[in-house]
Amino acid sequence: MLRRIKVGSNLNKKESLLDAFVKTYLQILEPISSKRLKELADLKISCATIRNYFQILSKEGMLYQAHSSGARLPTFKAFENYWQKSLRFETLKVNEKRLKSASENFGLFTLLKKPSLERLERVIECEKRFLILDFLAFSCALGYSVKMEKFLLELVGRSVKEVRSIAASFNALSLARQLERLEYSNTQITRFNLMGLKTLLNSPLFFDILGGKVLERLSKGLHFIEPDCMLVTRPVEFQNKRMQLLCVGKLECDYEGFFQTISEEE
């Protein structure tokens, strides 16, 4: 059912009309004429005034004309502007059943990743031949050297991610790769609606998104990754655990509606 849209009393503003246009488009996903926007968004201005704003917004690259009828569609620039203003990224309590169904209903690929809480507990020297890094949940071994032992002892108490990052920065690449494999195998990842990734099959980011590795280098928030796709990351509480949520989909997916639907508090 189409949601009635209210955009406030100051409807003569160009930004308000553009917001109303994008909100309406997200619900119907088809070109919008001035008459239809007035009806669906409940605008208290004339169709002629709306058409004038259509022309201005088209010149600014926010809208483009779909066909000779005068109906318009939002551009990438309009979506980018709208989502940057509309989305929030505070911690969200997530309902598991709603997350699964909403991912499919809204056409989004979603991934939940529980951050690894393991820390380097100790470094064990074995007869000057091996060094064993003990993270409690798992361990790894590498060849002994006095320099490496000293280096690792200074990292006791650090998280797996920190140890891996520091190892890579000091060119200890063998250790960094070993920790990456161990961390990945011990990370809890849950995926929903894999079909939501089909548009990214040829993207160089495909496997990093599928495996959740992209979360390591992206801050929470909004990221435009392809001409018609975007990625959203935010912290969530899922089954009483703090996790990271990754959402990927087309620009015209209703991300606001998705987050409202999966919220435990709704």
UniProtKB/Swiss-Prot annotation:
InterPro entries: HrcA, WH-like_DNA-bd_sf, WH_DNA-bd_sf. Keywords: Repressor, Stress response, Transcription, Transcription regulation. It comes from the Bacteria. GO terms for biological process: negative regulation of DNA-templated transcription. GO terms for molecular function: DNA binding. Belongs to the HrcA family. Negative regulator of class I heat shock genes (grpE-dnaK-dnaJ and groELS operons). Prevents heat-shock induction of these operons. NCBIfam families: PRK03911.1. This is Heat-inducible transcription repressor HrcA. It comes from Helicobacter pylori (strain ATCC 700392 / 26695). The lineage of its organism: Bacteria, Pseudomonadati, Campylobacterota, Epsilonproteobacteria, Campylobacterales.
